[in-house]
Amino acid sequence: FGYDEFSAHAIKVTRDAEIDIDNDVATTLIQKIEKGLKNRKKAKPTRLVFDKEMPSPLLNYLVKRLGLSTKDLLVPGGRIHNFKDFMDFPENLWKQRSIRKKVNIHPELRQASNITGIVRKKDIMLHFPYHSFDSLIDLLREAAMDASVESIKITCYRLAPKSKVINTLINAVRNGKQVTVILELRARFDEEANLHWKQQLEDAGIKVLLGIPGMKTHAKICVIKRKIQNKSQYLGFVSTGNLNEKTAMVYGDHCLLTSHPGIMADINSIFDYLEPSGFEQKKIKPLRYLLASPFHTRKKMLAFINHEIKQARKKLPSGITLKMNSLSDQSLIERLEAAAQSGVPVKLVIRGICCMHTENNKYKFPVKAISIVDEYLEHARVIIFHHHGHERTFISSADWMVRNLDHRIETTCEIFDKKIKKELK
């Protein structure tokens, strides 16, 4: 008997994902992003990953049809190219994942009847994914239902597909709270999702602001205003990571829950600046406890490094420890190199790109640099300066890159609680 033979081979095409936000004043940012999303689907291919068992005639046909011109764009692979799909597989398929330690509730919150009351008394640091992200959701839920809460202001960059954060904010506005969301539409690969969230939030009656033209809002901050006996009280949080309950299960991040009056005042100042009337004046109110990019972060970090250099040159104890995703800013790297040459012990924990030379004959001590590659993605930014033995410890949404220091709204927050400082170290 005659028969037909069929074969199937998987391919993955990577296209140029850049969305060009031009200066055409006749179109809005939303229109530009919508146009860019349409163009992305037919953008120029930059790579073809293919099944290495694919017959040459079929591969040549694909190369011709896609307009690929160099062998550098061709990557032979196996049968599966999209490993990200494994993230959505059931937990019990792999023994290693089924025996993963259960997520814990923070000890200070475990027996608490409400989180707000605890945060009013003391700072709490949540360490994701070891602590449950539900604690952050519960804080927002309490605010949504608390009759004394007047308003909630929050920034959103990347959100989960079925975001509990969004649901909580919608419930808050339904309960009569004034809710303001700074939503970043230009978060790469989340543009379409954030356009959807913008519509959802506005339909619910929430005030949605899109940040500053030409500058992404990457800060992760929130302030909740309560009115108790005609007196305003504030609490909220500063985080290194996104308000995304899905990625919080696999990304290592830190989130400070606090009612510190100075930190809350500074967060309010940042939100005032992000209002259209604020950034049109191109000025931000002086901040005392937070560092904000693009205004203060670079200058303050350089000052702290220079202080450690002076200490080392006086033969006094010194030290700098950095943990972040990327270290590529030239001016900060030059000062770190000067610190190493002066005898300052420099320790680096950099997940991604690190442009600093860690070996140099001029360094009095070798720079210790590592990258932690394990089950969780190390996303947190932590900065520690020795500072006469009274360590100055910061958490930040910003890596030490030009884009984060000069072209984005970012926040760096000093930690004052001794126990939390010890946890971070």
Which sequence ranges carry the predicted segments?
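N-terminal localization/anchoring segments of enzymes in phospholipid and broader phosphate metabolism
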Residues: 1-320, 338-342, 354-376, 382-425
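Hydrophobic alpha/beta core scaffold segments
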Residues: 345-349
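Glycine/threonine-rich ATP-lid/beta-loop region of ATP-binding domains
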Residues: 330-333, 337
